[in-house]
């Protein structure tokens, strides 16, 4: 059975969260997958954006809730 081609369009790059040793970036972008609605997307991307790792896509409503939940969160308070 042939692999289904996944289409994507990076509509806007918001920023890079981290870069790993192999040069892949964990990025926040606005991405349209398979001609669907553009969503905020957090995932790892190869240096040329040809290869893509697993990630998470969020609707506008989910992003609004996430912002609210993180508003008072201090990542430096968490014990490691």
Briefly describe each language-model feature range:
Residues 1-80:
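Positively charged, low-complexity terminal tracts
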């Amino acid at each position: 059975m042939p692999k289904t081609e996944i289409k994507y369009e990076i509509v806007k790059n918001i920023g890079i969260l981290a870069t790993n040793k192999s040069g892949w970036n964990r990025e926040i972008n606005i991405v349209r997958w398979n001609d669907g609605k553009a969503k905020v997307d957090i995932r790892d991307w190869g240096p040329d954006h040809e290869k893509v790792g697993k990630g998470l896509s969020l609707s506008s409503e989910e992003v609004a809730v996430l912002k609210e939940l993180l508003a008072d969160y201090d990542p430096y308070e968490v014990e490691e």
